[in-house]
Amino acid sequence: MSTPGELRTKRPRIVPDGIVAHKRDLAQRGGFTAVGIAAVVSFFGAAVLALTSSAFFGAIGFIAISCGVPLLPMVGLPARTGATRWLIAIVGSAAIWWWVGQLSAARVRKLAVASWADWSKEFGLYAAALVLGVVFALLIAATSLGAL
């Protein structure tokens, strides 16, 4: 039988598929899941650019890449190139998406019962705001350059 001192030092057992486990899972993986989603969107845009040659699909591909890597136009890509610019854009954008995923996880963890479905709703709201900002910035840039 355990003594009272031994009971205090033992870690509480967590039910593998319980409420605490889900909240812990959201806290640990929310940011990385958001980065993964952004990477998939970026790779989709790159595939569209690589597989098509029309102006319409080129615009769709560039918008998809810019949504996945929102710092891309901010560092001057694709007008100016260079490994440093690509590194800054990719690492900075990954940090932004990680932060958005962690923010979504933190807000969802406040609920009594948190799930990935709740995280995706919260993340969708923040991701939509970020994507709309990117699209509006690209529209302003295209208008100022005379492309629209």
Q: Could you tell me what each predicted segment is?
A:
Residues 1-36, 145-148:
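Actinobacteria-biased recognition of intrinsically disordered, low-complexity terminal regions
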Residues 19-85:
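Membrane-associated alpha-helix detector
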Residues 20-27, 95-123:
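Cytoplasmic membrane-interface segments at the C-terminal ends of transmembrane helices
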Residues 27-36, 119-129:
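Alpha-helical membrane-anchoring segments
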Residues 32, 56, 98, 136-138:
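Extracytoplasmic/cell-surface-exposed regions of Actinobacterial cell-envelope-associated
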Residues 35-39, 86, 90-98, 126-134:
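Alpha-helical transmembrane spans of integral membrane proteins, capturing the lipid-embedded, hydrophobic core
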Residues 68-108:
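Short alpha-helical packing/oligomerization segments
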Residues 133-148:
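Juxtamembrane boundary at the C-terminal end of a transmembrane helix
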